[in-house]
Amino acid sequence: MISIIVPCYNEQESLPLFHKEATRVLQGIGQDYEILFINDGSKDNTLTEMRALAEQDPHVVYYSFSRNFGKEAAMYAGFCNARGDYVAVMDADLQ
């Protein structure tokens, strides 16, 4: 399994495109995968978007912090919860 960790802070507009592109690439690999979105205390509707994606796609898992703890804490939470044999961290804006 491949785990993709995506720390997110105010990324509601980026998440649908990220999900679409990441899913396209991951499906092409032919391995089981999961996408872990970590909401780092976003002030916009990032959490709502994560919930919607998780409802649509069983490969999506999300975790949410009560406040902003920083990217490193979000990455650590992702590493602690990733189930994959291979783990990568990506920015939600696809950079």
Report residues per predicted region.
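Structured catalytic core of nucleotide-sugar glycosyltransferases
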Residues: 1-95
